[in-house]
Structures are given as C-alpha cells and as structure tokens.
C-alpha cells in the first residue's frame, strides 16, 4: 500500500507546485477609453538599403552596376570565391576582436555581359578615369565585328520597359584611336527583339564623351534589356551607363520610382528616417555610410559595399 501511495503523492505535489508557479495575470484593453495623445509628428517611415530596397527598388535607375564600381572593396578586405572577408573589427566596449564574412559575387563584371565570347572581350580597368572618386571603367575589345557586338545589361531582374514611354539614357564613353565604327544604344525585349534604337554620337576619339539621349520602346517588355552595340573592331572604354524612366516621382531627373514613391507619400509620414540603422555604422569604420558622398554628379559617386551584403550605388 505504501508503494502505491508514494507515486500519487509525488504527482499531487508536482501539480501543486505548477499551480503556484503560474499566478493568474491578465491584460485588459478598454477600447472605449482614450489613452495618451500621440503627436502626429511621431508617425514616420524608415528607409534602409536592405534586399534592394533602394537599387532595384525605390530608386528609378534601371541599370545594374552603372558605374562599374561594384567590385570595389574597402582597404584591408579580400575575397575568396563567393565570400568577402572584411578586416577584423575590435568592439569598442568589450575589446573583443571579431572576424566576419559576407556574400560576394563571382561575376567578372557584375550586371554586364557580351553577346559573344569569341569576337570580343571585356575587363575592368582604371585607365584614364573620368572621375577619381569612381575610377573603374570597362574596356571592351572588339576583335571581329562581322556581326555587331552588344554590351548588355538586364538591370535588376529585367527592365520594365513600357510602350511609348520615354527613357533617358546617359553614357560616358571613350573610343580608342583604333575604333572607327559607330555606337548604337538599343532597348531589347527579353527575347532580344529591338524595341528602340538610337545612335550614340561620339565626337572625340581618345577622350571621354558624356552623352544623353531619349529612347521610346515600340512595345512593352517586363524583362527588357539595354545594350550598346559596336559595329567595328577596336577598343572602347565605357565609364558610365544610366537609364531612367522619364516619368519619375514628381518628374525629377535621377529620381524615385513613381509607383513606389506615391505609395509611401500616401502614408503621409511626418518624417523619413534615412539611411537606416546598421548601414550607418558599416561593417567597419572604413565602409560606414558617408552621406556627403551621395551628393553631386551620380557618375562621380563611389558607391559602397554595405553591411547587408551588397554594393549600393
């Protein structure tokens, strides 16, 4: 009898202790009673360049890696395959030294491809940069132009090109003395059909030509492309290629995507917190966000590899 009683006593004691460990507490919300006033100025929105919230998102730029700076990294960083290793960081409070790693692209020129691998080649160079703050440019060597060679950019998962809408192209280009051909800008469908074509009128060989022109596609393509076409052998250097829809938020050049920005405007925020949180401090002090570098000519801006594992223009 004693052996049977002991287990029951233990269970009863356990249940009793559990009951005491969970006191009855409740939260009562009275929807009929008004609480403290919250100033309208306390309601705002937060923006940080995470997961292409800016490049490929709110920012209306259609070209990915427009200034060929995406492979630049701060001093002391290095890449192994698809991993970026930043310099070691010492915590300013604990003194702990941390090693981190971030994703890195293995594309030789992020965002850009050639229509042929045999008749032409491309590589990044810093020869005679247009801007010291954004020194990289693309050297395109055309070996055989029996079929014109195209330098292609698909943007961020394709460019949304709308029939009869106007798009503003700006390119900074320098043909070497051995290039005697023409350069043509093309808007292409996902299948490669030409939706718009415009000559890029180069006036000075061996010098940087900063050129702007408007283009209108004859059909809509949700995953369109931009191409620069070369029809002769020789070498051409490309420093900058930008394509914006003319219809941006409030029709501002170098502006925001109209559809996304209007949704944000409709929230009637009292303020915008920018540039965010972790982006401000950076992975290390060398790549912290410096807002003064985001001013001036977009072609002269260096961009930065951010805390969130991507380069931002």
Task: Name each model-derived stretch.
Residues 1-24:
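Bacterial Sec-dependent N-terminal signal peptides
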Residues 18-312:
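Extracellular and organelle-lumenal recognition/adhesion modules and their flexible linkers in secreted
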């Amino acid at each position: 009898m004693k052996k049977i009683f002991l287990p029951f006593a233990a269970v009863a004691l356990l249940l009793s202790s559990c009951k005491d460990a969970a006191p009855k507490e409740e939260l009562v919300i009275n929807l009929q009673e008004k609480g403290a006033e919250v100033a309208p100025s306390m309601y705002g929105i937060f923006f940080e360049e995470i997961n292409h919230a800016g490049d490929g998102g709110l920012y209306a730029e259609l070209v990915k890696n427009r200034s060929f700076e995406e492979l630049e990294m701060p001093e002391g960083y290095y890449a192994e395959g698809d991993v970026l290793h930043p310099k070691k960081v010492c915590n300013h409070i604990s003194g702990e030294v941390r090693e981190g790693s971030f994703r890195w692209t293995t594309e030789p020129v992020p965002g850009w491809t050639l229509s042929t691998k045999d008749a032409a080649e491309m590589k990044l160079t810093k020869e005679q940069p247009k801007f010291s703050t954004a020194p990289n440019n693309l050297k395109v060597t055309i070996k055989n132009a029996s079929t014109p060679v195209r330098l292609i950019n698909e943007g961020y998962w394709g460019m949304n090109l709308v029939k009869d809408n106007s798009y503003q192209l700006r390119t900074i280009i320098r043909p070497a003395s051995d290039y005697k051909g023409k350069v043509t800008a093309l808007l292409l469908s996902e299948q490669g059909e030409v939706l718009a074509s415009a000559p890029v009128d180069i006036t000075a060989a061996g010098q940087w030509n900063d050129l702007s022109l408007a283009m209108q596609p004859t059909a809509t393509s949700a995953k369109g492309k931009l191409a620069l076409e070369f029809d002769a052998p020789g070498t051409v250097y490309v420093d900058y290629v930008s394509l914006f829809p003319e219809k941006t938020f409030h029709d501002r050049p170098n502006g925001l995507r109209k559809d996304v920005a209007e949704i944000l405007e409709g929230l009637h925020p009292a303020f915008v917190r920018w540039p965010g949180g972790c982006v401000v401090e950076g992975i290390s002090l060398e790549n912290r966000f410096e807002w003064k570098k985001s001013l001036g000519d977009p072609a002269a801006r260096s961009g930065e590899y951010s805390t969130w594992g991507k380069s931002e223009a």
